Amino acid sequence: VTAFQPFLDDYDIALARNNVQRKNMPTSPATRPRTVLALQGGGAHGAFTWGALDRLLEDGLEFSAISGVSSGAMIAAMAVQGFVLNGNKGAREAVSRLWRRVADAHIFGTVNSSLDWMWGWDKSMELGSELAWSGITNALRMFSPSQLNPFGQNPLEPLLSDLLDIMAIRHPSAPRLYVAATDVESGQAKIFDNSQITVDVLLASACIPMMFPTVSIHGRNYWDGGYSCNPALTPLLSPRPDRLVLIRAQPRARKGVPNSTADIVHRLHEIAFQAPLDGEIAMLPKQVRLLDISADAALARHPLTSKMNTEKSFLDHLFAAGREAAAPVTAT
């Protein structure tokens, strides 16, 4: 206990400071609607979610529960831990820190380097480019993902290990957090709550099996949660909220038929990831008001492969688009 006491003291000071700040805020009316938040996954397109959430938090919205999958799960975890330490301001700072680190790390560089033996491959290519995805598609015709990535590297692991604050997420004052991953063998969604959140859980929720190694947790194997729910809405409904804010990071519709192998694969993923969410939306109680923040307009002019583009300029563009798209919600 002694070894950890300085850290715990600092942690308690931060929590106490947050409590004082929140006490000095105007008292919320008793009729204030109970609001929950659902964050869709979408790779780099999650920067749109970042922007939308930043606007909601800036305008004072508070969420009693957050559900996320894939990149949405990482945003949800950062928001929850940031809120515990410094309210909405802390949540905004924590999510921003995540995306700045993603941009600085060129997060898919590790995957690129595993393909540099291929003729014509340049590991400096962004995975968000058509040429890069053509190379990956060709490689996967000849080799399994484990052969392309024999050491099981996941570029997100060191980043999340550095950023994730499990103590904050598990603090009694934390908003409820739900992260979904897909059980490989059963095909069912596994929902992890605050008490179960770890780096491995976030990696599992974002595990695209054609790119990253399958994540094993307590003897079960998991892939991206988007295959089974994108994100899970049901856990947010008990106790029943007044409003559910859904931030999408994938377009529901795209004009035209994709022709390249890369675009076909990505569109298939978008359609597959959309179906579970549509089913849950259809089952929402009529008393719950759905506030849907769509990414359709923001993503319409970008190629399907752009979800792998972690260039800072692109992430900043999506961040700005997300803030703009969220404006009507904050006015309601």
Where are these regions (language model features)?
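Patatin-like phospholipase
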Residues: 2-69, 77-332
